[in-house]
Amino acid sequence: MKMIDIVKNKKVLVLGLAKSGESAARLLDKLGAIVTVNDGKPFEENPTAQSLLEDGIRVICGSHPLELLDEDFALMVKNPGIRYDNPMVEKAIGKGIPVWTEVELAYLVSDVPIVGITGSNGKTTTTTMIAEVLNAGKKPAKLCGNIGYPASSVAQTATAEDTLVMELSSFQLMGTESFHPHIAVVTNLIASHIDYHGTFEDYVAAKWMIQRQMTAEDFVVINFNQKEAKELAGQTKATVVPFSTQEVVDGAYLADGKLYFKGEYIMDADQIGVPGSHNVENALATIVVAKLLGVDQQAIQESLSAFGGVKHRLQFVGEINGVSFYNDSKSTNILATQKALSGFDNSKVILIAGGLDRGNEFDELVPDLVGLKKMVILGQSAPRVQRAADKAEVETIEALDIADATRKAFAIAEKGDIVLLSPANASWDMYANFEVRGDVFLQTFEELK
């Protein structure tokens, strides 16, 4: 292990728990560090902290006392959701204490190759696609990272034959130093998490940290459909392999409805197991990674054809009386909803949209709304979504929440229609996260059956 000497007998502060914090604390303890865990949730309501204390790890809960950092910590490992303007983080940085996320630990604790996937949309689907295709091609792959499996836990179980396929957020990448994937994928870049990063440029810079330790023997896979992503191609030492649905590139591309890798036919686009132009892009990125790692064409084709998608990401839920239901609750921005709509005949679609009001106008979405059968709108942003619907000349129905919206959409649907939850907004005005929102949609579908 590369990091035993870094942490053994050193004091390390783990700031914030959740899955990644617990994983980091346990790994550091195992490696001989003197670990302190600090979490804002009160101890009596914090079963994870209770479990760590039972196992001999020091825990301080209920607040984040700045005086804690008067101790001689050699390292802070923070939860990626904790911002860099947090007073604890600011004090640590001011004292010269390195601030990592558990992704850095994962890299240092294992010698297996890493495929890292980042971007604004499509990360989870592409990460899952890549892992499934690699496994189908007898290249053992382990999913980890932002997809829900802490990288530092999974890395400890990896064998020499494995590849870690790691979904990476900008928050996670900001807390890395030596992290060095063999292949990095950038799915796309749109303005996201500006409240965290401050500017789009800072957001892109955080994403681009994925490649800063890479060399010419490594590969960066970039979406050449996007100007913002394409511009990064000249800013890396790694070998760039592009993908595109708009032009023939020296990588993976779409031409005449077929997918190719450097001139080699892989499969027809309509064979991909999930709909939408965005999933063609996700498949092309997957094809690049698979070919770079030696997976044959047949395994790629069979795996992508069988791919069933990921929960809350244009997930086909089922049919009731000939009406199809799709759960795309993960679509928390305009681009994601545009991509979702691109896979369907608008005249058959009843779109459920709306959510947290971030002040966005939805003019960019108007061309994609034209021709929709109807829209069901809800949430804080409903008035803004209504204005976009008016411009697209689409009739709307207002709903109180997702359950109400789902029932109202089904009530007006006819055989052959599609009820699509693709909100184009975050969920936090009504729901804790997009997963909870999507689960309400799924539960209502079951009740309607």
Swiss-Prot record:
Pathway: Cell wall biogenesis; peptidoglycan biosynthesis. One of its GO terms (cellular component) is cytoplasm. It comes from the Bacteria. SUPFAM superfamilies: MurCD N-terminal domain, MurD-like peptide ligases, catalytic domain, MurD-like peptide ligases, peptide-binding domain. Its main location: cytoplasm. It catalyses: UDP-N-acetyl-alpha-D-muramoyl-L-alanine + D-glutamate + ATP = UDP-N-acetyl-alpha-D-muramoyl-L-alanyl-D-glutamate + ADP + phosphate + H(+). NCBIfam families: murD. Its EC number is 6.3.2.9. It is an enzyme of class 6 (ligase). GO terms for biological process: cell division; cell wall organization; peptidoglycan biosynthetic process; regulation of cell shape. Cell wall formation. Catalyzes the addition of glutamate to the nucleotide precursor UDP-N-acetylmuramoyl-L-alanine (UMA). This is UDP-N-acetylmuramoylalanine--D-glutamate ligase.
